[in-house]
């Protein structure tokens, strides 16, 4: 098995005005990695991370023209919308099928988890479904059980942070990790005081697009510290340097609170808590949690 990956910093991406503009940049990066490793574009199948499609159950889906259209014209911006497009182009080069698996919009919420205090607003399921379900299955196999037998709290720690309650193979509750719910993260604002946010929205200082960027893309650690590089921030926090330590510790505090909330969703019956995602490589962050 050959594996490779990379972190695209906020500085690398700042000149792109819309995520769709990153298509060639990300596609060329992947093709360059393969070329440098001497791996020819000759595959039996290509599978990619899913995108922000309509709510759907977990599973594997073939990429088709309607899916590609929906991703190109998605209401919500995220780099995951490009995965299927890149996979489709790669698959066409070698004449093989292309798929996505467990897209971010996997929706298995229990009915009570959908309600909010405003009838016109319903909670929606957007989280790191692919990774969360994959590590859950891997953990289950490691203890000789099936994913569908376990109750798990899975914490994905990346540019966005999702904390989900996995009840016997279904994610019955999880924060919307993209659009302003749950912990704040390297790039997301998370849950914020509603009244103060309403005042900010109608202050006349910001456009709708700017406000949405505060929630997703320019919120969280970037807003406080000017960077989403958690490894660098954690190094400074470990040395006691402010404001890095205070901000990072506060972010991790919001994560821990969300874990506690998911205990309630699972009625206190939890077999394991799983930490995954890039930030899970940080000893400082894992230790704090």
Model segments located where?
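Glycine-rich phosphate-binding loops at beta-strand->alpha-helix junctions
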Residues: 271-289
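Short beta-strand scaffold segments in enzyme catalytic cores
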Residues: 1, 161-165
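Short beta-strand-loop/turn "lid" adjacent to the catalytic site in phosphate-handling enzymes
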Residues: 34-79, 97, 105-116
